[in-house]
């Protein structure tokens, strides 16, 4: 769930629709919390590795806000989230709160990577077969490299999508999705299970 959606008046309705989608893990973007990290780095000059850890905590802050706002469950770190998924019979969405102290993220620690690639990493980590990117802008193309150039996804994402080629990827402009639940359920249709990232579906 893109961080820029934090400023969207559609966010409450978006969360309401997500609540009806079973077996859903929500990966929050950094939103305004990550913007604060960028400003702090510019003012104080700390390195990108520190900024990366702080940006992960910014994602966790936005995620905690979403969980509180929508009444969703939340889990700190990928390991706890995976354990919660394994033991829980509940179908309500679960929000991942990234934890730089425990998440062994096999990714570059820089601003070149955002919640997009982290969501793809988590999908691989928990054995998910589909990833849906909820954005606050139109998705003009299905080409991941073009989306990265347009800064709709981060610049690491196209390469990661090739690495995790078994995970189907969809992109939705959530600000104009009047029937988001139906569109999400369409993403999870069995007939689309083998869609490859290079054939990203756009809604």
What name fits each language-model region?
Residues 1-188, 196-203:
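Nucleotide/pyrophosphate-binding catalytic subdomain
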């Amino acid at each position: 769930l893109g961080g820029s959606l934090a400023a969207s008046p559609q966010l409450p309705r978006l969360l309401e629709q997500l609540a009806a989608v079973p077996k859903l893990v929500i990966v929050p973007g950094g939103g305004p919390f990550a913007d604060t990290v960028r400003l702090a780095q510019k003012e104080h000059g700390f390195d990108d590795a520190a900024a990366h850890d702080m940006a992960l905590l910014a994602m966790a802050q936005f995620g905690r806000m979403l969980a509180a706002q929508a009444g969703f469950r939340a889990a700190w770190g990928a390991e706890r989230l995976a354990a919660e998924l394994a033991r829980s019979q509940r179908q309500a969405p679960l929000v991942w709160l990234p934890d730089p102290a425990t998440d062994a993220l096999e990714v570059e620690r820089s601003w070149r990577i955002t919640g997009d690639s982290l969501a793809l990493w988590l999908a691989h980590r928990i054995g998910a077969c589909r990833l849906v990117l909820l954005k606050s802008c139109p998705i003009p193309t299905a080409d991941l490299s073009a989306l990265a150039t347009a800064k709709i996804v981060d610049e690491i994402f196209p390469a990661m999508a090739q690495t995790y080629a078994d995970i189907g990827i969809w992109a939705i402009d959530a600000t104009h999705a009047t029937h988001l639940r139906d569109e999400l359920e369409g993403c999870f249709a069995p007939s689309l299970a083998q869609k490859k990232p290079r054939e990203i579906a756009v809604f």
